[in-house]
């Protein structure tokens, strides 16, 4: 729709009128790519206009700082105080697009940013050759929940070698009203109604769904014994990804001696056992992935630990440090890599 884009561009022009250089994507992009781009472009901050995994009436802001992480205290309070200080919107400076372009304040981000983002994800792939050997035999159903994941998820699956990818047609194209979804959240079983129907039609091995801003991943896998599709909680899928990644890194000699595993305090204690198994420092943080992303900056500033993996039970994890927020696209890559490294076994079996 025009309205959300117009509202976003209005904010852009206000920043430019205050002499702030702005980079804007030419079309919708996933939240983790925004986090990535903030650091790539050496920006002071980043803004994502999104309803995230909520109904459209909750459309709002996610704000990132120069490290690519969502803001935490005290910046969050300071920003809100500045917003409250505006009593008359007529006092807000604005500028037209042409003048902003001439002054070098309005900049469209090129498609090379997409390439750089995908390249960063692929660096986390551990068994590319093995995966390609079995990829032809795997059927994947995917839904972007009418959001931003459609293009990058299909691209990463294609570049990994997966050809049998079936996208839920009713939820493929961007739809700011989420017409087919009461609640576009991978945690909600009702959100998988269309995906499950398609999976049964094509006899899919696995179902993947990303929330509209593509930072949360939901997974269903076919039980080879019953033929039914079973869902995985955020704890389950997070631990499967963690075990796969850490075991493969250990086997290949890629684990850091001072590695750290970060989780939120409400997430499963199984993470403690996995961290111990791989001799990693377990760090617990408050609920919210921004506190996991914050730890990466602490590690770098203080030269203490190397980030190995982070997750929260609400269907979010981060593999690598290319972004500083949860990333469903890299989680898709890790999930299919884990599941199909064993060729004809499924996550339900494991």
Task: Annotate each language-model stretch with its function.
Residues 43, 149-153, 191-196, 203-221, ...:
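Extended, hydrophobic alpha-helical segments in both membrane/secreted and soluble proteins
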Residues 59-193, 198-199:
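Gly/Ser/Thr-enriched, mixed-charge loops and adjacent short helices
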Residues 64-93, 235-258, 263-271, 328:
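Glycine-rich phosphate-binding loop plus the immediately following alpha-helix
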Residues 200, 204-206, 228-230, 248-350:
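Phosphate-binding and adjacent anionic-ligand microenvironments
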Residues 7, 11, 58-65, 215-234:
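Short Gly/Thr/Asp-enriched flexible loops that form oxyanion-binding sites at enzyme active sites
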